[in-house]
């Protein structure tokens, strides 16, 4: 009886595990968390430097996946990161995503991004220019705090929520 029950449970769960497979992969120096079920990929932590261009799609295990988010701490303290190009498939920038990226000087947030999570660009002391495209809805607490070189920022009318201390410590 136990063998039949175990076999029955295995038959039920096996299709679920293959259908929702999640994995990590590094492609062209960028690390991704991939969910093939939803055909999505999230940029995750790696020791990035220089100019980084995130593609809109990646191929993983024969599946085309859209890069839809920049994960929590994806570029955490990547002090040698000088520029980032974010594709129009990204809808969110995670918590602490670019915290401490001191060599990053400018960033353009594409119109596909709806939310910039808290502390996303905290203490990016070299950041001078931020362009937020129309489409962004929410800028969470402390998103740009500590960016003491920030001299220009464009915030579109689409932004309906700006959290606390978003520009704290900016000159």
PLM features: what roles do these ranges have?
Residues 29, 47-69, 79-92, 102-115, ...:
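Structural signature of tandem-repeat unit edges
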Residues 36-51:
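Secondary-structure transition/turn motif
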Residues 26-40:
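Short, ordered beta-strand-loop transition motifs
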Residues 8-15:
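Bacterial N-terminal signal peptides
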Residues 18-27:
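Boundary at the C-terminal end of the N-terminal hydrophobic targeting segment
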Residues 72-74, 94-99, 117-122, 140-145, ...:
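Consensus positions within tandem repeat domains that build extended binding/scaffold surfaces
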């Amino acid at each position: 009886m136990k063998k039949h029950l175990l076999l029955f449970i295995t038959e039920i769960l096996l299709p679920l595990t293959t259908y929702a497979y999640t994995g990590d992969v590094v492609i062209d120096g960028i690390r991704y968390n991939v969910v093939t079920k939803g055909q999505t990929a999230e940029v995750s932590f790696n020791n990035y430097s220089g100019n980084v261009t995130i593609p809109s799609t990646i191929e993983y295990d024969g599946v085309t996946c859209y890069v839809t988010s920049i994960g929590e701490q994806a570029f955490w303290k990547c002090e040698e990161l000088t520029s980032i190009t974010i594709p129009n498939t990204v809808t969110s920038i995670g918590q602490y995503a670019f915290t401490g990226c001191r060599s990053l000087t400018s960033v353009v947030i594409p119109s596909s991004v709806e939310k910039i999570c808290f502390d996303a660009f905290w203490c990016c002391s070299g950041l001078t220019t931020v362009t937020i495209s129309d489409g962004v809805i929410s800028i969470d607490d402390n998103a740009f705090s500590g960016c003491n070189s920030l001299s220009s920022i464009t915030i579109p009318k689409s932004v309906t929520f700006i959290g606390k201390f978003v520009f704290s410590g900016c000159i």
